[in-house]
Amino acid sequence: MAAEEATLTVRLIRSFEHRNFKPVVYHGVNLHQTVKEFIIFLKQDVPLRTSLPPPLRNYKYDTLKILHQAHKAKTNELVLGLEDDDTLLLKEDRTLKDSGVASETEIAFFCGEDYKRYKANPISSW
């Protein structure tokens, strides 16, 4: 079976409150790899991207959540939608494809603790 590859946009979220994020496009992502393998890849790749400012490169990202899938509705949230965590948060033991990721999917990469704190009190600082 040939590896199914996709183009994904990963939104690195540094701060929910300050709406501090940056999208990074990845081409040729194997959708048959597990979410955990993709997280490991991102943790190795992000610090090496000199085009990103140091606060984004050196942050403790650990969680992936689907933001938007091609040809489907987008959320009104500017940084990340707070709903549907049970279906949109990616579980590490599943493959990207089994998690609903397809070509042109936009995924958020963030610190899970920050997300829980923001979800409990979703107030922006500006």
UniProtKB/Swiss-Prot annotation:
InterPro entries associated with the record: UPF0538 (IPR018794)
Annotated Pfam families: DUF2340
Family the UniProt entry places it in: Belongs to the UPF0538 family.
Protein name: UPF0538 protein C2orf76 homolog
